[in-house]
From Swiss-Prot:
It is found in: Cytoplasm. Keywords: ATP-binding, Cytoplasm, Kinase, Nucleotide-binding, Transferase. Catalyzes the reversible transfer of the terminal phosphate group between ATP and AMP. Plays an important role in cellular energy homeostasis and in adenine nucleotide metabolism. Transmembrane segments: none annotated. Monomer. InterPro entries: Adenyl_kin_sub, Adenylat/UMP-CMP_kin, Adenylat_kinase_CS, Adenylate_kinase_lid-dom, ADK_active_lid_dom_sf, P-loop_NTPase. The gene is adkB. Its EC number is 2.7.4.3. GO terms for molecular function: adenylate kinase activity; ATP binding; nucleoside triphosphate adenylate kinase activity. PROSITE patterns: ADENYLATE_KINASE. One of its GO terms (biological process) is nucleoside triphosphate biosynthetic process. This is Probable adenylate kinase B.
Amino acid sequence: MALNLLRNYSTKIRMDHLRMTIIGAPGSGKGTQSEKLKKDYNLPIISTGQILREVSEQNTKSGIEIKSKLAAGELISDAIMSDIITEHLTKTGNSWLLDGYPRNTEQAKGLDKYLNVKMALNVVLHLDVPEKVLAERVQDRWVHPGSGRVYNSVFSPPKVKGIDDVTGEPLVRRSDDKDEEVFRNRIQTFKNNTLPLLKYYEDRGVLYTIDSPNSDEGYVKIKQILDSILTK
């Protein structure tokens, strides 16, 4: 599904009522694009990946379960994800960006029920990146554990190799990026669970698919969409 730049943008969205999510396979650039959107549009980010990694380090029942699921490249249960997301949404205002949630239709329906019609998602960005590019990206991906900032040693490297630009702390590779079998499992899980979700949002008229393997070009398209539909 290619990006349709000829879509009718007659329905405008107020900047302070922008409720958006980014959907994409592992390595599609959700974190990278989220950070750019945060900077350019002053959007609070709720990053499910970062939240889950933080919870997985806790010695609790949920933490142990999440750590096991992440290590295997499996999805976290809908119930746990719903609790985590709603807890963070209660602390956020009317405008925000969800990074990596929902991941299946049931989660989307649960989110809609929680938000109700007046507060529903009004922009869903789908980052459509070829699988070969995804595999290359995760091999070159480095993250700052404390903030979740994502770097790529090829197309978005840190100023100093292996060092976070902001804090000066060391960067690391995610454990689920190192194992090729785990990565393949994550891709298949995405196809099985998340791709049907696109039809759900397409039917609601809020889906925008960006089919660019280049991160910078993809962000240009994202800005083109948002600048066309946002109003002060």
